[in-house]
């Protein structure tokens, strides 16, 4: 029989869409209230002064000011604060 049968389908070809996580405003940058500072899964960065934390752990500015990153405590937790201008 000179017929070519259908080839098997590949098991590859799937990948999830990137989630665009990470730091959006870096230390020293000026932010306005509501600006997103960090998008993250879990609290890699913790909210400090004038920073709010959303349902999905997104950190955002509560006031206008300058972004500041700090490491505090014996656990070495990273905190993000907004220093009012």
Swiss-Prot record:
Entry keyword set: Ribonucleoprotein, Ribosomal protein
UniProt region (Disordered), positions on chain: 1-23
Family: Belongs to the bacterial ribosomal protein bL27 family.
Any one cellular-component term (Gene Ontology): cytosolic large ribosomal subunit
The organism's place on the tree of life at top rank: Bacteria
NCBIfam families noted in UniProt: L27 (TIGR00062)
Coiled coil ranges: none
GO MF term list: structural constituent of ribosome
Pfam families xref list: Ribosomal_L27
One annotated GO biological process: translation
Annotated protein name in UniProt: Large ribosomal subunit protein bL27
């Amino acid at each position: 029989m000179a017929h070519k049968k259908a080839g098997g389908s590949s098991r590859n070809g799937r990948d999830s869409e990137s989630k665009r996580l990470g730091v959006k405003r870096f230390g020293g940058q000026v932010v306005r209230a509501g600006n997103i500072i960090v998008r993250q899964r879990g609290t890699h960065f913790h909210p400090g002064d004038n920073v709010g934390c959303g349902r999905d752990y997104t950190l955002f500015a509560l006031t206008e000011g300058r972004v500041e990153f700090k490491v505090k405590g014996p656990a070495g937790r990273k905190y993000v604060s907004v220093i009012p201008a």
